[in-house]
């Protein structure tokens, strides 16, 4: 672009399954983390459905120029390594402090409702919810054809227990 603006257009591999859940969850996760103050690229637009002019699912997101840590790690001096590790541990601490009500993948509530007919388990910010697990291991190959529960899964402590008599 003429003004230096750059963005990334991402489309899923043909074997990505299920595309809707994968794209919808990735976008919701990125936007949720960004709204929580974590340094995540901005998502400009997305479609978890192929029902659009491009005829494919997509994510249009901010391009961030930088250097891969793995490219410079071996040349870093000890103070730089300590600084990097401190920054990473601070980010991880912030990430792990975000409460989630259930196991599964993160979605925009309205996206999940469109495809699953359910709103999932809401977060404090009700734009977001926890829904089916979108990890590839849950859907790979013929697993995508199985009619099984993929989440959300509430913690065991939330299940009612009947005391033995």
Residue spans for each PLM region:
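ATP-binding pocket architecture of kinase catalytic cores
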Residues: 1-165
